[in-house]
Amino acid sequence: MTRWPWAWWTSWQRPDITEVPDLSAMAFIMFTSGTTGRSKGVMLSQKNLFTAMPAFLTPFEDVRSQTGWNTDEFSSLSCLPMFHISAMTSLVSWSVTGHCVNLCNELKYFYRDLGAMRSDVMAVVPVLLKSIYNDVMKGKRERLNGLRVLTCGAAMFNPAVLQDLMDRGFFIAQMYGLTETCGDGAWNSSQEEKYLTSVGHVDDSCQYKLEDGELCMRGDPVMLGYYKDPEATAEVLDAEGWFHTGDIARVEPDGYMYLTGRKKNVIILGSGENVSPEELEKLLAPCAAIRECMVCERNQRICAVVCCDPDQQDAVRDFVTKVNRTLPLYKHMVVEFSAQPLPRNAAGKLLRS
């Protein structure tokens, strides 16, 4: 996999542009999604941004080598809000390299804008991916107007959905990153089925380690700190410069990384047992009757909150019963049905608090 060196970026200099005296100084502030608490201002520098950019461009070298498509002529459709770090870093990366970036007015106008502005690639969150998937499976791919590369991030994706799209000619790239790392972290450009549940290969721009299962990162993409919040900064940035992501992960010998949950999301039962809600949500994902689900704790029991059609509730109960038979007793789930879609933030992440 090709890596773009820092020197490549510094070569994009023009005589009429004054060089910034300190690339490590704060240049802009992005806010965290606030899925488990209040949103925090993340202080980022130009150095953070430009060292993270290669992670957003490198996968397209893989697209070119694996498909033969001319990615130099690609245009992208940006549907994520600009306060999302992935949207910001992608926009700057593609603009710097001379690509066309089409901006979607609002998500509700997605199909209108995609039809008006032909785009080869787009970053998607689970809700948007599900809509694209439904169109493809219903034989309505013409609505996508040539869209063929999907970069997936912000949450876990159903591997069966990804495989179906790949079987129908889409190139799927998965990503892992945080606002605190300027979106950098890992990219998965492999089209092999065995890697569909991986967020990707660790990135050369950072160092990685696991501390009690928690993924920690250190390197140039890591933030300066939280704006006017030294206490919160000290909770995640240690004295040696390691950023504690809060994500529980494992890294296999081949370098591929797998996320198993969020440290803050872990449910601690009265028995002392720890339960990862994301682990159970993955087990429920294959159920076709489930539109959305979120696992949480209700009265010291594990509860699966499910959004589905009313006539599919029995099918959901049967599926959960089958899953429970494969689990230890303390992980057994009860089902609670929701008539409304589950709450999400603007980036498509479930709001768990």
Q: What is the role of each PLM region?
A:
Residues 1-23, 136-138, 342:
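ANL superfamily adenylate-forming
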Residues 12-31, 37-38, 64-75:
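Conserved pre-ATP/AMP-binding loop-to-beta segment of ANL
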Residues 27-54:
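Conserved AMP-binding A3 loop
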Residues 50-75, 82-123, 127-146:
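Conserved AMP-binding/adenylation subdomain of ANL enzymes
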Residues 114, 120-124, 132-194, 207:
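Gly/Ser/Thr-rich phosphate-binding loop
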Residues 201-202, 212-236, 256, 273-275:
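Conserved ATP/PPi-binding loop(s) of AMP-dependent carboxylate-activating enzymes
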Residues 219, 224-225, 248-328:
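AMP-binding/adenylate-forming catalytic core of the ANL superfamily
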Residues 337-353:
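Flexible lysine-rich "adenylation lid" loop at the C-terminal edge of ANL adenylation domains
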